[in-house]
Structures are given as structure tokens and as C-alpha cells.
Amino acid sequence: MKNTDVKYLEPHILSFLNNENAMNTLHDIRRGIERELIRTTPESRISNLPHPEELGSALTHPYITTDFAEAQLELVTPAMTERKTTFDSLASLHHFVATHLPDNEIMWGASMPPELPSDDEIKIAAYGTSNAGLHKVRYREGLANRYGKRMQLISGIHYNFSLPDSFWEILHSHIGSELSLNDFISERYFHLIRNVLRNGWIIPYLFGASPAVDKSYLINQEHALNLLDDETYYLPWATSLRLSNMGYSSNEQSFYPTSFNSKQEYLADLCHALTTPSERYTHLNGDQQLNASVLQLENELYGSVRPKIVSDQLRPLYAMCHHGIQYIELRSLDNNPLLPLGISEDQSYFLDAFLTYNALAPSPELTDSERELIARRQELVATEGRKEGLLLPTQQGDRELKELGLTLLSSMMPVASWLDNVFATEGHKQGIEREKVKFIDSNLTPSAQILTIMKDEKLSYKHVTQRLSEMHFKQHKDVEINKEEMAGLSRLVGESLAKQQRIETLQDMSFDEFIQKKNDLQCDCEIEEVVA
């Protein structure tokens, strides 16, 4: 019986792959990487020191900032067309940070946190005294009060990906779409997102690297994890505890599902969550969150993939309404502590093939029942994905994970060959072949490799991660980086600090007024109305 959960490319799309003009546009695919890391001490504990001034302003630096906690770094590369340049940029950021941290700190290379103190001792990120900075702090206070600080200290990698407008323009013509080009691009990104949701279980299976956690993460939590040693809890077949229900998730948001069937439906659902008070949060006062809505801000929406747009003038909801989607953010990648950068160029080849395939394969609208299947699949793969003979729910009934995975990789091959032809490489096909073997032998997955090290060497999660992090930290410090790039990063430190100071000096309203203005959200945005 043919597995129809995996979508094969349709004939008119296969003919599109032979379009020379379309092929030429692919050199303008852009990819950017964001990596979250925690600054830790030699004892594998979260640092209690402030964000180093030598790294610049966390509020205004474009590439080196903080996530939830003061000790939680976020390194952001620009979106670039050359894969090597993207990874060189990520390596440069790691080198710059490694050479500017206090002597007793390193960067924790895993997704699940190091040893954590009590919540009271975990410092929320600080951004200065400007309204914009205080707004970021208040938002994080809300996250802490809603979900707890521990969950917010789970770190990951975000892979930002866009196909060029020229590519979409040719596909628009090839299909004969009656939508405007801007609307067509947005709808195709939602098309891509729906398929990423369907097929996204493959990401934690292949790249999940969080099968275990330090016991301090679980204080005052109910859980079903097994004790590996005095300091470590784990699940024997887990791939990514980070992506499981005990990881980065929100029960409240599950009652307000967001549609990805069209831009209009997505924006309507998002605005509903941003303007609907939640009974769970109304007991918190104004100092404890930005507002009592299901979502304080758009960024609070959890999920493995997001539509994105960059705008300095408009909040994301309005920017997306007026200008459409610019790129997608794949959020389901764990930090792989076995890799110096947490992600590799080889992995990037696979991700590009995966995302391009999802942009081109058939993508019917998601029903409520299919969304439930997707959620069950992700939880099964996250918690027991390496279990021999594991069955995953599909619309045609249960199927073996191995069968589903190999079928999906096979269906991606025409796109991988196409990309290899364009870029004169074998990287995309090799990427798929490299991942195929993990379905044949689950011991080759990073989650299995990490558990093997822990068991064979009788070391805790904390000690294995500390050792790997120290090794990679030394590599980051020792690596040779382009002097011009280092000078540019040094210059950005001063510029970002000066920019923060200017912002703090030029306050034009009180913080209460600022909050009120930010919370004033209307859900009647007209799609046709274009604003600056």
C-alpha cells in the first residue's frame, strides 16, 4: 500500500525543476543561523555574572545578544547566500565571544541546561533603562511567571531560510496563479510550513541531541524520566527531551491553535491569542507580565516553525499583514554538543533539501485531526524515537518510523539532485544518503551517541556536556578568524553601547504609556493597505 502521508512531487513541479531560469535563481537562497548558549562556570553551573560589556549591548547589538536569561547568549548570523560564509560568520561569533568572556566561563554546548540554582537565583536578561529595554524585561518576567524560569533556559538552534523572490516569480508564472506575487509568496511559505509540520518529526529523529537532563531541571516537576545516575535523568529511546512535552512547550496555547492554512487565517488566530485574556494569567499584576493575554507578544507563540518578516517600524503582526512573509524560521534543531557550532555544514545541505522539498511537494490544508496526529508523532519521536519497530500514527494508520523515514528521504531525492546540479556539488544528495543510515542503525543518531558516551564512561549528563563544551570552547578561542571581521565585531561593541545610551537619553514617554501603546492592538488590519 502506497504511503500517501509522504507527498511526491507532482508532474508540473517535476517539469519546473528543468526550468533553467528557475535553477539560476537558487544561488540567491538565503540562510541564517541563530544559536542560544548558556554561560557556565567550571562546575557546570549557570553563571551569575552580567552580560559582559566587552560583547556590547544586548539590546542593540545585531549579532550578539541574550535570550531569556542574563547568562543565555544568542549568537545571530546575517542571512547570506553563501553557505560557507554563513558558517564562517557563526564561527567568528563563537571566537569573539570565547575571547571576551571572563576567565572562569565557557559556553554550554547542549540544549538542556546545566546545573540550575533555585528560580530566585536565575537572573532574567537586563537591557538597560530605556522603554524598549524595560519592555523586553517585562516580557521575560511574564514568561517566567507563566512557564517557570527553567523551561526558558532550554536552548536551541534556529535555521532561517528563504527562497528568492525571483524563484517565486517563475513558479508563480509556471503554475499560472491568479494571486498577486506578494500574496503568492506568502501562501507558498505557508504551503512550506504545513509540510514542515507534517514531515518535521524527522528533524528530532535525525538531529535530536537531548536524551538526558540534569536532575536540577526537574525540581518540583512531575515527570516519567528514568534515573541514569545520581545527577542525571533520561529516557532510553529519547531523541529530544527539548521538543517533548516536558521541554519547551505551552499547554495554554494548545487551547488556541493557530492555523497555517493561509496568511489571513494565521493572522486572525494570532491576533485572537494576542487580544484574548487567559484565565491562567489574569491573577498576575501589571509588574509581572506585559498583559494577561494568551500571548503577550508574537514571539511567545511556540512551535517548530514560524513565518517571519523583518521590520523596524511595525510589530510582526502588522508587518506580515501589510508586507507578507519573507522567510521561515525552523526552530526544532537541538544544539548538538558533539559539534563545535552545534550544527554542521553537512547538516545544512540536508536542511536546504528538506525545506525546498517541502516548498514544492503537495501541501493540502491541515485539518484538526491531522494536527493531532502531527502532535502525537512529534511526542513519540521526541521521547522514544529510537525504539526498535516504533509505530507512528499517520492518516492511513500506524506505520513504522523506519519505513516512513526512508520513504520521505527517497521522495526528497529529485530536489536534492536539482540543488546539486545548480550548485555543482554532491552535498545535498550526500546529505540524504548520510541520514538514511540513521534509519538503518539508530545508534548513529546524536541522541544515541551521547547516551553511549554517558553509559560507557559512567559519566553524568553534566560531566559529558562540560567536557565537550570545554573542548569546543578551546577550539573557538584558538581558531584563526579574518582580522577584518574581528575588527568589525569590535567596532560593533562600541557602536551598540553608544546606540543603547542614545535610546536611553531620548525617551519621549513614560514606561506606563509605552506599555499601553504596545498593548493597543487592533485585529482589523486591511491586507491591501500598505504602510511604511
Q: Which residues make up each language-model segment?
A:
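A glycine-rich phosphate-binding loop feature that marks nucleotide/adenosyl-phosphate handling sites
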Residues: 113-115, 213-217, 371-381, 428-441
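Short conserved micro-motifs at the rims of enzyme active sites and ligand-binding pockets
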Residues: 48-51, 87, 120-121, 171-172, ...
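Extended, compositionally biased alpha-helical segments that mediate assembly or anchoring
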Residues: 425-532
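Short, flexible loop/turn elements at secondary-structure junctions
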Residues: 39-41, 77-79, 111-113, 161-167, ...
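Terminal catalytic/cofactor-binding subdomain
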Residues: 1-144, 151-157, 184, 191
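Loop-rich catalytic cores of soluble enzymes, especially ATP-dependent carboxylate-amine ligases
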Residues: 19, 134-146, 153, 162-322, ...
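Histidine-centered divalent-metal-coordination microenvironment in nucleic-acid enzymes
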Residues: 36, 151-164, 327-334
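Substrate-recognition/cap regions that form aromatic- and gly/pro-loop-enriched pockets
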Residues: 321-322, 328-416, 420
